[in-house]
């Protein structure tokens, strides 16, 4: 309880605590997060490496091909209420098992045959990933000490980016050896390995739980402790007000973060090809720096937050984000620098946002609710941002308008995330 509350305990005969849940070591917590994170983005990326093969084999139109990446992102937004209910009913561990099972099955179904199976499997993957998107922050908040949350969140963000990069690099060579169907289906092995880990971990934790002594029965004559907490009601109200204010700011911040990320990912290669005259291979390689540099941001935020404050790290990320569109507008010849800075920002921005939420979420339920609201808003914005940026380009015949859109989105992240980080550290 906060120091200013006055606590009066009228009876010292306290009831014995129920059996505590077995505590998982930090190593195994991180290991569990890593095996899930690898499967939370990679299956979406895999088809993009062989999209021409898929279209030639299935007759999928360009708009249908866009659904292979757009549909999961839309489901990230629409399926968050389902994920929240699953966590409340089954707990985060079982929800993660459902997530990995869905990703594994969806990845296989997607490669089986017709266009309907291709899109149906993709939808299943998106819905299953949403379960993991919400469950992982809940696990981090519950099992990780608060001062290590940014580090573990950074590892989570970094592994998602590494998984995407590995999948992007590996799918095309696999397709050359065995065809695109086997190539994209092969990534189900990663989800299967993660599923095996989590099933074994749950069995172990249940065995440890069963071996713990039963709760001490309380005699009917034993008086229950009477605790009078003066000011507790007002403190709780104040905490909820802070929680709601921070969550509202983070919803806006993640809208800017996600929309800027997906718009940049969709159009940066073409932008560099058309505006700087780069060949397709060079523009793609330069754009890949935007993805790879995310690992620096994911780990850089917790390191900087440890040495200074989280709001300082968030402000640095904000400056890097804003430099991407401004740099491409004012100094386009330095596009490699701006791509790297933007990549650092997109990895660090995710880490910063999901390191702020646990500071105001005082329970697993509040954590799940906040994570769901933030991700629903962010991914809904991300669903429409690439199309809107493309429309701006075709309407104006220039990349200036899409870059101004990305500037507005990154400024939204910068202002809202920085304010949220600052006010949480004041309380």
Range-by-range predicted roles:
Residues 309-353:
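C-terminal transmembrane helical hairpin of 12-TM major facilitator-type secondary transporters
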Residues 364-398:
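A late C-terminal transmembrane helix in Major Facilitator Superfamily
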Residues 48, 245-288, 295:
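Extracytoplasmic gate region of multi-pass secondary transporters
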Residues 115, 146, 156-206:
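Helix-loop-helix hairpin linking two adjacent transmembrane segments in secondary transporters
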Residues 116-124, 337-342:
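Paired small-residue
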Residues 78-113:
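Conserved MFS/SLC helix-loop-helix module at the cytosolic interface between two early adjacent transmembrane helices
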Residues 123-158:
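Cytoplasmic helix-loop-helix junction between adjacent transmembrane helices
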């Amino acid at each position: 309880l906060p120091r200013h509350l006055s606590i009066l305990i009228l009876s010292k005969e306290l009831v014995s605590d129920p059996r505590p849940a077995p505590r998982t070591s930090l190593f195994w917590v991180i290991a569990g997060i890593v095996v899930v994170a690898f499967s939370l983005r990679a299956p979406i990326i895999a088809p993009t490496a062989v999209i021409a093969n898929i279209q030639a084999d299935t007759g999928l139109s360009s708009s249908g091909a866009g659904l292979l990446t757009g549909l999961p992102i839309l489901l990230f937004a629409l399926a968050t209420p389902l994920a929240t209910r699953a966590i409340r009913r089954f707990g985060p561990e079982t929800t993660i098992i459902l997530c990995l099972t869905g990703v594994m099955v969806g990845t296989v179904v997607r490669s089986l045959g017709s266009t309907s199976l291709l899109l149906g499997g993709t939808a299943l993957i998106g819905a299953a990933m949403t379960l993991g998107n919400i469950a992982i922050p809940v696990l981090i908040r519950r099992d990780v000490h608060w001062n290590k949350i940014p580090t573990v969140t950074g590892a989570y963000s970094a592994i998602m980016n590494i998984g995407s990069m590995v999948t992007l690099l590996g799918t095309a060579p696999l397709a050359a050896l065995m065809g695109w169907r086997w190539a994209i289906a092969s990534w189900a092995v990663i989800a299967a390995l993660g599923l095996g880990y989590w099933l074994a971990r749950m069995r172990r934790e249940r065995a440890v739980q069963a071996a713990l002594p039963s709760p001490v029965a309380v005699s009917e004559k034993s008086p229950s402790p009477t605790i009078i907490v003066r000011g507790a009601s007002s403190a709780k109200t104040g905490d909820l007000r802070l929680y709601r204010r921070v969550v509202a700011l983070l919803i806006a911040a993640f809208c800017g973060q996600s929309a800027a990320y997906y718009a940049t990912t969709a159009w940066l290669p073409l932008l560099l090809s058309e505006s700087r005259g780069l060949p397709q291979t060079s523009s793609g390689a330069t754009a890949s720096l935007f993805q790879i540099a995310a690992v620096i941001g994911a780990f850089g935020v917790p390191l900087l937050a440890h040495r200074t404050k989280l709001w300082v790290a968030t402000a640095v990320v904000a400056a890097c984000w804003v430099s991407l569109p401004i740099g491409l507008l004012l100094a386009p010849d330095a596009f490699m620098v701006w791509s790297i800075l933007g990549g650092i920002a997109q990895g660090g921005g995710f880490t910063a946002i999901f390191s702020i939420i646990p500071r105001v979420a005082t329970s697993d339920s509040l954590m799940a609710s906040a994570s769901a609201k933030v991700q629903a808003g962010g991914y809904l914005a991300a669903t429409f941002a690439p199309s809107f940026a493309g429309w701006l380009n075709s309407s104006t015949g220039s990349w200036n308008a899409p870059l101004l859109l990305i500037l507005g989105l990154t400024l939204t992240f910068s202002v809202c995330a920085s304010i949220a980080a600052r006010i949480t550290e004041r309380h």
